[in-house]
Amino acid sequence: MTKSLYIAEKPSVAQEFAKALKQNMQRRDGYLESDQSVVTWCVGHLVTMSYPEKYDPALKRWSLETLPFLPENFKYEVIPEVKKQFTIVSNLLHREDIETIYVCTDSGREGEYIYRLVAQMAGIKDKKQKRVWIDSQTEEEILRGIREAKDESEYDNLSASAYLRAKEDYLMGINFSRLLSLKYGSAVASYLGTKYQSISVGRVMTCVLGMVVRRERDRKSVV
């Protein structure tokens, strides 16, 4: 007898799917299972982009000569802290009795990215994959999402945008953090009275930091 596999983004959401299915689910290690279905979960991201030293051990040492770091092909790896759950999900994806995979990660770009990375690392190719897109976690909405699930390929553009955003963030963070740390890290460390100071740069964090600094300056300028 074949079964359907439901993959949620987090355990709490997986529990809601299990309740909505109203099947006699039995608790297993990292998933729930009935005669008809298997429900499992990620714990947020299970896979991440590899640091430069995974491309070349020499890149562990920060140097201006090795910048910019622009790999032709990006490498990915399982996050060590969640390796056990990744292995559980990967094994379920490959189970012979699993006929259809329902992607139930959060309905959005990041949720799509979380699943695609898992499927990529697990090497899933020949399984039927369907996307559950819901606006809430009520029983009615979950069942509607399952009933109206579309082929996962219809979300390829969303996936592509997620991969592109992640690569952009990665390249900006790696290159500018190393560059500014090498150029100004010593000056910042001297000012702070520390031995060494790295300077972190990111698409979001740097903008937010700028907003905080601007707000603090405005506050101090008030007479």
Model-inferred region functions:
Residues M1-R178, C207:
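Intrinsically disordered, low-complexity regulatory segments
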Residues I114, V118, A189-G193, R214:
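Short alpha-helical interface elements
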Residues Q197-R219:
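Extended, Lys/Arg-enriched charged tracts that mediate electrostatic binding to polyanionic substrates
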Residues Y163-K167, L171-G202:
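Amphipathic alpha-helical segments of the small helical/lid subdomains adjacent to P-loop NTPase cores
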